[in-house]
Amino acid sequence: MLTYIFKRVLYTLPIMLGVTLVCFALVHLAPGDPLVSVLPPDASQAMKQQMMTLYGFDRPYYEQFARWLWRAAHGDLGASIASSRPVVSEVSRAVGNTLILASVATMIGFALGTLFGFVAGYFRDTFIDKLASFISVIGVSVPHYWLGMVLVIIFAATLGWLPPTGAGPGGSGKWGLDWEHVRHLILPAVTMSVIPMGIIARTVRALVAETLSQEFVAGLRAKGLSERGIFRHIVKNTAPTALAVMGIQLGYLLGGSILIETVFSWPGTGFLLNAAIFQRDLPLLQGTILVLALFFVLLNLAVDVLQTALDPRIQRS
């Protein structure tokens, strides 16, 4: 097991290096002036050149990348052009809020998706199967930003049960474990959970249906094993894949939360990315993308290790 983990870590290192290169290239090759958020419209050419030198934008791309990679390896992602605050502090605060939102959304999606998937797979080719499958298809198909706006109109604007935006009372940018903060979390978390719910439901449904059609299940029933015992065998066979899908969905939610966080003004990485894009804040933009990409790579590594621990056949293969 330790040898397998060591190999997976070694495989991850070149992936991380490639992620940093792609992140740097995408940000720096995009059109636009990186100093548009700090320079006045009537700024002189001398002032522009001075700012370009200050932020190192006048250097060759390979030199900029080498300096940025060296500093990033030491925990320094530079300073935001728009706010002059360290990128690390900006991103760390936003990542914490996004982790809370994505984790809660993934747990909701996993719970509902597993329930719908098991029910649909166990009662396959029945009305219950068709209903659960229809719900999962709706979850995958509905645009979550549209669903978020619909939920805001119903539960915030019309009924007034839940707050429409923010992470806490008074526009607080920091989340806390109390009822007011939980109320702010409900709408974005439910909205974000719809896609993982649909994907997990379809995956679990296929796994359960496949397991029930295997010969060993018929043999267990012939031996008189109860349905509860058969259910335990089904869980054992579907758990590794279901957990892997859940981990991947958590990674996707971490990186794909920009629309949800913008709709609900949730102060996470998606909201931060949106602001950095419009302000053309290159240090903040590439720092945020890098942190999210590394989170996704490390999360996939953790999922691989967990899946191998649950199913040793993966390691042997």
Predicted regions and their residues:
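Membrane-interfacial helix-loop-helix junctions in multi-pass membrane proteins
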Residues: 53-62, 77-87, 168-185, 192, ...
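An internal, D/E-rich "acidic patch" concept
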Residues: 58-114
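Hydrophobic alpha-helical transmembrane segments of membrane transport/permease proteins
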Residues: 15-66, 159-181
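Transmembrane helix irregularities
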Residues: 30, 139-142, 254
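Membrane-water interface segments at transmembrane-helix boundaries in multipass membrane proteins
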Residues: 134-199
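Alpha-helical transmembrane segments of integral membrane proteins
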Residues: 2-4, 13-16, 92-128, 144, ...
